[in-house]
Design a protein with these regions (language model features):
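Conserved alpha-helix/loop element of class I SAM-dependent methyltransferases that forms part
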Residues: 1-5
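Conserved class I S-adenosyl-L-methionine
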Residues: 6-12, 108-139
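Class I SAM-dependent methyltransferase SAM/SAH-binding core
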Residues: 17, 21-64
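A conserved beta-strand element that flanks and buttresses the S-adenosyl-L-methionine
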Residues: 81
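A short glycine-rich, Lys/Arg-flanked "PGG" loop and its adjoining helix->strand segment in the class I
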Residues: 93-105
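Short alpha-helix
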Residues: 182-198
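Core SAM-dependent methyltransferase catalytic element
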Residues: 206-231
Length: 233
């Protein structure tokens, strides 16, 4: 996706990598996140990148109607980017609809969402247990699942598990996975159905590398189809 001169919204900007990379590529960037603590993380990343101006950011939930109205009043975006975040909101389908609603006609919606797998409900219980457990039990769960996740990833991908693409070491990757809750998931066909009903077409799709990983989508916003009543007039 060519970002030069485009308006770019990053949903769940976190430490700000996508936000700052988009700025480097010439986009006019904005970011939203539900956690105000990520402003400090973004500031640290900005210093590493050597970016002089702090990107425009807002703190709020993609599920908050008042917050969405505030964003929409300022206009929709050429590119809306929501990478691996909407499945942690507690209402993934609504979050997808809300995020897609911020895209201009002809604009691009980029998202990554956890894939549905037979083991997904099991992981949901594990993640909920981790969240509700004292620190000692959390550490024990990481010790138990570290070799399980290590072996599964090695078998499925054929790659060394410590060679990650996420910018964190494998141990913290395991902590992030086991502790990532709320946790929702959907098959690729489900996501395509949700988004295409909103007058989008899918330009690119990449299946999850591991069964419970993220399916990756690039959609383009189409012009709304005329209703039958309008076409008769």
């Amino acid at each position: 996706v060519d970002l030069a001169g485009k308006s770019f919204l990053d949903i769940g900007f976190g430490q700000g990598l996508a936000l700052l990379l988009a700025a480097e590529m010439g986009a006019e960037v904005s970011g939203i996140d539900n956690d105000a603590a990520n402003l400090k993380a973004l500031e640290s990343t900005r210093a590493v990148f050597g970016v002089e101006t702090m990107p425009r950011t807002l703190i709020g939930s993609i599920l908050d109607k008042d917050f969405l109205q505030k964003i929409a009043r300022e206009g929709r975006y050429d590119v809306v980017h929501a990478w691996g975040v909407l499945h942690h909101t507690g209402d993934m389908q609504q979050a997808v609809r809300n995020a897609a609603g911020l895209v201009k006609e002809g604009g691009t919606f980029i998202c990554a969402l956890y894939n549905r797998h037979w083991s997904s409900p099991v992981w949901k219980v594990i993640k909920r247990t981790y969240l509700r457990s004292p620190q000692a039990l959390r550490k024990a769960l990481i010790v138990v699942f570290y070799p399980v996740i290590y072996s599964a990833k090695r078998i499925v991908t054929g790659a060394h598990p410590t060679q990650t693409e996420r910018g964190m070491d494998f141990y913290h990757d395991v902590v992030d996975w086991v502790g990532g809750y709320p946790y929702e998931y959907a098959g690729a066909a489900e996501v395509l159905r949700w988004v295409c009903r909103l007058d989008f077409e899918c330009l690119r799709f990449r299946a999850a590398r591991v069964p419970t990983g993220c399916n990756e989508f690039v959609f383009r916003k189409l012009r709304p189809r005329p209703s039958l009543s309008n076409s008769k007039n």
